[in-house]
From Swiss-Prot:
The keyword Metal-binding applies. Homotetramer. It comes from Synechococcus sp. (strain JA-3-3Ab). Pathway: Carbohydrate biosynthesis; Calvin cycle. Its main location: cytoplasm. CDD domains: FBPase. This is Fructose-1,6-bisphosphatase class 1. GO terms for cellular component: cytosol. Mg(2+) 1 binds at E94, D116, L118.
């Protein structure tokens, strides 16, 4: 029997139980996020054929990182998909020092979209998977709009979160706090079609994902965790350099992803508000755990839009093993 074809927009409406104004706005917003994803997926599929797709721009972004050409394209794709729609007022991006106003005269009380437009962009020249990460927030009414203080809120207040994975197929995974659902782009239809609903992270998995090249810069607790998994059967290392791709594997198969702080940079590398928070929201919705090692990611009150944090995320039992190594109760 043929399965029902459930599109992303129809699924969002079902999540909100009807055609309420809120449901229609969210459905429209998810469609615009999906549109940006389609634009990026098309461009990536032509990488190497279109001049100016591969390589770097020669400039440095607000994070102090060399900007890839596709970083710039992906950021502009989200702006183009959302400007003049009235669905969001502010776009917070890894590539922008201050939020973009869409349009400039919009009401700041409208929703805000926070994005990493292209995570893992250094993978593109090698034709490896990359992704986009997004979070939707409603500004806090009791916080001043000046300096975007109204957006500095814990991740538990996210209205929606998700990512788009550009791999052998293009997949969009999202949650509005009612489970985690995955959609696959059907290029012939130009639609994201529901492929998996109510995803659950296995309680334990065999995969541990981290860049062991930083081993000597980590704390003794993280080093001990690596020694622990090296000395036991049942663990396998998988690390692609793209957060979305590595997290997606763990969402489906179980395990743990780690990007800890180093002795030189204890605050870590990943951005809280548009990388760690969205994935932590998905992880908890799917029965997993996300922590800095001392605090739940979703409980952190941000101090700035581009704040960085360490991240340990994945299956409950795998994360517990890491935490026990950090506290010293589990030794190699």
């Amino acid at each position: 029997m043929a399965r029902d074809v459930l599109t992303l927009s129809r699924h969002v409406l079902q999540q909100f139980s009807g055609f309420t104004p809120e449901a229609q706005d969210f459905s429209a917003l998810m469609n615009r996020i999906a549109l940006a994803g389609k634009m990026i997926a098309r461009r990536l599929s032509q990488a190497g054929l279109i001049e100016g797709t591969l390589g770097v721009t020669g400039s440095v972004n607000v994070q102090g990182e060399e900007q890839q050409r596709m970083d710039d394209y992906a950021n502009r794709a989200f702006i183009r998909a959302l400007e003049q729609t009235g669905l969001v007022c502010r776009l917070v991006s890894e590539e922008l020092k201050t939020p973009a106003r869409l349009p400039e005269n919009c009401s700041l009380s409208r929703l805000a979209l926070l994005i990493d437009p292209l995570d893992g962009s250094s993978n593109i020249d090698a034709n490896l998977s990359v992704g986009s990460i997004f979070s939707v927030l409603h500004p806090l009414e009791d916080r001043p709009e000046a300096d975007n203080q109204d957006l500095l809120q814990p991740g538990r207040r996210q209205l929606a979160a998700g990512y788009i994975l550009y791999g052998p197929s293009t997949q969009l995974v999202y949650s509005v706090g009612k489970g985690v659902h995955s959609f696959t782009l059907d290029p012939s239809l130009g639609e994201f079609i529901l492929s998996k609903s109510d995803l659950r992270i296995p309680e334990r998995g065999s995969v541990y994902s981290l860049n062991e090249g930083y081993f000597c810069q980590w704390s003794e607790g993280i080093q001990n965790y690596v020694r622990y998994v090296h000395r036991r059967d049942g663990y396998t290392a998988r690390y692609s350099g793209a957060l979305v791709a590595d997290f997606h594997r763990i969402l489906l198969q179980g395990g743990v992803y780690l990007y800890p702080g180093t002795r030189q940079k204890p605050e870590g590398k990943l951005r809280l508000m548009y990388e760690a928070n969205p994935l932590a929201f998905l992880a908890e919705q799917a029965g997993g755990v996300a922590t800095t090692g001392t605090e739940a990611i979703l409980d952190i009150v941000p101090q700035s839009l581009h704040q960085r944090v360490p991240l340990i995320i994945g299956s409950r039992k795998n994360v517990e093993e890491v935490l026990r190594c950090l506290e010293g109760s589990l030794t190699p």
